[in-house]
């Protein structure tokens, strides 16, 4: 037996560790390998470079509202292929694929609940649903959110993210720009606050309508915000655009938005702003996440 064979005979093979899929992920910006559970606890913000990754609509709403207070609105509304549209694929097949992938019926999720005990209505876009395009159901759900805020006499918060209008619905999609803007005008007449939170990316018809109509327009760091994308603009004007063009830091320098807030600080910041606008006590940062719903008590005559 050669010395190599003697060494090989003394080697005990070990079983390769089985790591479940999805335990680790990589930061899109710095490339750091991150533990998935830790990243979720950090609200999808990279602990190394502070890059804000995309967050599902439901996770965003659950991270915002008090535990146990969430009630979904407009879940019965579903998209329909009224035009029988077809490009390289039937629209109804695209819808079925997006619904299966995301578990959502459409790109906007609306819930009412409480934020530090204060009643609010909140909406958030699901990025993975057909590029967060705006169709008729998105418009209908947003209007439902506005109407619920008026009914409850409470603020509305919307986390926008969109690639624009949904071309498969043609004019019915474009009509949602006017429909949502008109609904917000009625809310403004009531004097109820509407805060728009712009996330990456917020483009097209959404940015040209309700995403930029907030009483306060807040953006997450480095979010891409605009109508047409930078590549399209460069090809049109045939000029090189300035650095960070259409990013939230560029927009705040030009006065296009009101403030930039990091995601981990968003919940308390929104609650503090709304408390001032609604003339309510400032939120307690140490308060538990449980929902505290305190309905107004109407003035009543004592029973005889």
UniProtKB/Swiss-Prot annotation:
Residues 23-292 form the CoA carboxyltransferase N-terminal domain. GO terms for cellular component: acetate CoA-transferase complex. Binds 1 zinc ion per subunit. It catalyses: N(6)-carboxybiotinyl-L-lysyl-[protein] + acetyl-CoA = N(6)-biotinyl-L-lysyl-[protein] + malonyl-CoA. Pathway: Lipid metabolism; malonyl-CoA biosynthesis; malonyl-CoA from acetyl-CoA: step 1/1. InterPro entries: AcCoA_carboxyl_beta, Acetyl_CoA_COase_Trfase_b_su, ClpP/crotonase-like_dom_sf, COA_CT_N, Znf-ACC. It holds the Pfam family Zn_ribbon_ACC. Zn(2+) binds at residues 27, 30, 46, 49. Residues 295-304 have a biased composition (Pro residues). It comes from the Bacteria. Residues 284-304 are annotated as: Disordered. Its cofactor is Zn(2+). A zinc finger (C4-type) spans 27-49. Keywords: ATP-binding, Cytoplasm, Fatty acid biosynthesis, Fatty acid metabolism, Lipid biosynthesis, Lipid metabolism, Metal-binding, Nucleotide-binding, Transferase, Zinc, Zinc-finger. One of its GO terms (molecular function) is ATP binding. It is found in: Cytoplasm. Its EC number is 2.1.3.15. Component of the acetyl coenzyme A carboxylase (ACC) complex. Biotin carboxylase (BC) catalyzes the carboxylation of biotin on its carrier protein (BCCP) and then the CO(2) group is transferred by the transcarboxylase to acetyl-CoA to form malonyl-CoA. Acetyl-CoA carboxylase is a heterohexamer composed of biotin carboxyl carrier protein (AccB), biotin carboxylase (AccC) and two subunits each of ACCase subunit alpha (AccA) and ACCase subunit beta (AccD). Belongs to the AccD/PCCB family. This is Acetyl-coenzyme A carboxylase carboxyl transferase subunit beta. It comes from Shigella flexneri serotype 5b (strain 8401). The gene is accD.
